[in-house]
Amino acid sequence: RVRVAKLMRKAGLRSIVKKKFKVTTDSAHKFSVPENILDRDFKPGTLGAVWVSDITYIRTQQGWLYLTTVIDLGDRKVIGWALSETMNAVDTVISAFNMAQRARPITQKLIFHSDRGVQYACHEFSSMLEKNPLIIRSMSRKGNCWDNAVAESFFKTLKAECVYQHKFSHREQAALIVFEYIETWYNRKRQ
């Protein structure tokens, strides 16, 4: 170990250490929860058939930033995303979903899958989805991150390849680097 550490230091390399897991999903709420229609079928075959979404956190020296993404399982691209200083539904899931709709208008039956977080279950978001008869809501089973594995996997990749490589002094710096990662690297080259 010591020899490897010395060689890495000499080469200007550093290892990526996985950070301790922090729970960000508040599923202890009174809102209704749709059944898990997706049921881990992560290969829909066509664009616009299944979107998955989740929220993660990014630490900065100014405080937390919360990143919400919407991924189309047809090509695994991040088609909608939002960064927010708060965890409210308007600034997170609604903003990311609206971006996804602008990028890929809903023209066929769509399964929208997420975890059971309060942002996804709240009246503001659920009533917005219910206005479109083409959207079928689906939520992971309680405490089961594997039901939303594609979204979780994207966050693991983002953090290993991007977030953990930086120490963000302010939120704007983190926002710029996350934007560059998603829009110029992940969606265009990484996949």
Language model segments and positions:
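Charged DNA-binding/catalytic regions of mobile-element recombinases
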Residues: 1-191
